[in-house]
Amino acid sequence: MADNIQGFIKELAFEEALTHHLLDHGWNEVIKNPTEEQLVQNWADIIYGNNREIDKLGNYPLTASEMKQVMDQVNMISSPYEMNRFINGKQVCIKRDNEADTNSFGKEVYLKIFDPMEISSGQSRYQIARQPKFKTADSMLGDRRGDMMLLINGMPVIHIELKRSKIDVSQACYQIKRYVHEGIFQNGIFSMVQIYVAMTPEETLYFANPGT
């Protein structure tokens, strides 16, 4: 990617080059233009894939109401610090309401969401969400579109804003601050973001999610 650093006169070309660079370094799947609902379903699918034991989910995927139990727990978290503890807590508890799962129906089940010991191994999944769609807290503002998110096991933990060559990196920082001000990262799956990255072909800044 560095060889082409002077050639990124268009932001999209920079985004594509960064995507290929990530794919060459362990990230293994690209999701294009996902909505929040699609990312929640993607997370649900990964949780199911990582919890197929008979005493967990077996052969029965999470129902919409079971995934809502997970999201309700996410939405109860009020700070990035607490969210980090949630993610690194390795598992989440739900009460099975899928009647087809006669083994676990009506029981509390603990589901693995992330294991720090499985970084780059085990059941870890590394995905790139390109140009995710955001809903603002105020419907009058309309929807927004980010540049890139990095997902670990379906959880969007890194948000990246890009600017082309000869645009100051502060403009990407401003874009992130604007999204924060508009409440995009306040609730739902996007509230799981831990790190913001502002990036041009010439410069990169990153900082922890400071919360509201």
Predicted segments — roles?
Residues M1-T212:
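An alpha-helical interface "stripe"
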